[in-house]
Amino acid sequence: MDPLGDHPLCCNKSGDRITRHNRLRNLVFKLADTGLLAPELEKLGILGVTDKTRRRPGDVSIKSWSFRRGLAIDVAVIHPLAASHLGKAEPCESYAQTQKIDRYAAAFVHSDYDFAPVIFETSGALNKEGETVLKQQVASGTQTASETEKFNENKVTK
């Protein structure tokens, strides 16, 4: 163990980083699935038929997010005390902009999907756009649960 105890949180050489990413990606997927949003994991071809790079910038994609538009959610986990984030007031926002939006947003212009980076910090913080997307997913799940409850109540009373 290192003297500060943060090595496991920020080391790029261990499988912990990938495991942490996959667990949070699966959580985002489960939220969308609970809300009956029909999510897909790492959908290939999300950037359209003209994109030959075979990139999959959407860890979780939702085909029917808004009117005639889907949503590609790209999940990332960062450690705010890593050297690349020190001195940044909002590491999640900075990472979302430089590593996700700047890299992928232009590719979505001719796609049927919008793009939303959901960036978690190992300390628990979340970028603003990610928070908005997750709140919308929770609201969808809550609405779905409420409708199911009403349906079950009607079934019992008849």
Model regions and ranges:
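Short Cys/His-based metal-binding microdomains
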Residues: 1-24
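Acidic carboxylate-rich catalytic motifs and surrounding loops in phosphoryl-/glycosyl-chemistry enzymes
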Residues: 41-47, 113-124
